[in-house]
Design a protein with these regions (language model features):
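Short "lid" loop at the C-terminus of a central beta-strand within the Rossmann-like core
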Residues: 20-22, 52-55
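Conserved beta-strand signature within the Rossmann-like core of class I S-adenosyl-L-methionine
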Residues: 13-15, 42-50
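A short SAM/SAH-binding and catalytic strip from SAM-dependent methyltransferases
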Residues: 12-27
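Conserved Class I S-adenosyl-L-methionine
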Residues: 56-81
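Residues at alpha-helix caps and immediate loop-helix transition turns in enzyme cores, especially N-
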Residues: 28-32, 51, 81
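S-adenosyl-L-methionine
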Residues: 1-7
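SAM/dcSAM-binding transferase cores
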Residues: 83-163
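A short glycine-rich, Lys/Arg-flanked "PGG" loop and its adjoining helix->strand segment in the class I
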Residues: 26-43
């Protein structure tokens, strides 16, 4: 369990990739990602294949700077190969790495939709089903833009990933 990692142990790099947030929400909760952040060195990196708006928004809200991992060929269906989150990056650090790119306007707008509502498990004891239900309930009550409206605007009939 992440809660058992001693606070003095810090990592330069954490690769977090179990399953998508819809399959394994426990490792994508606001609380779990906060513990990940606390385990990073001063300029530590978190790398994941996830492009989920909920994950990206949570990382930003936790104070990490995020970039997308560029696919070889960008299309409307393949616009990101994942996310890199950096704690205290050097100014314009992404420009030195050909695999990193700032989020596009489309991706930034995605972070303003109901898809960006985080997964939550304050006590670290909820089941996947409970986490997903809490999030769905919060999405239903939210005044954020429905994700379907965002998808239509960007000509996406289906989500390229589970958000």
């Amino acid at each position: 369990k992440i809660c058992h990692i001693p606070k003095h142990i810090k990592f330069d790099l954490i690769f977090l990739d179990g399953f998508s947030p819809q399959k394994c929400p426990e490792i994508w909760t606001e609380e779990f990602l906060s513990k990940i952040k606390q385990s990073l060195n001063h300029r530590g990196y978190l790398i994941t294949y996830s492009s989920s708006a909920a994950v990206r928004k949570t990382l930003i809200d936790l104070g990490l700077t995020i970039y997308k991992i560029k696919p070889k060929i960008e299309t409307s269906a393949n616009w990101s190969n994942g996310t890199i989150a950096i704690l205290n990056p050097y100014f314009d650090e992404y420009k030195k790495n050909s695999f990193l790119k700032e989020l596009s306007i489309m991706e930034l707008e995605h972070l303003e939709t109901k898809a960006s509502i985080p997964y939550r498990d304050p006590s670290f004891d909820c089941t996947s089903r409970e986490i997903l239900k809490k999030r769905k309930d919060e999405q239903l009550e939210s005044n954020l833009l429905p994700t379907e409206v965002w998808r239509k605007k960007w000509h996406m009939t289906k989500a390229p990933f589970n958000s």
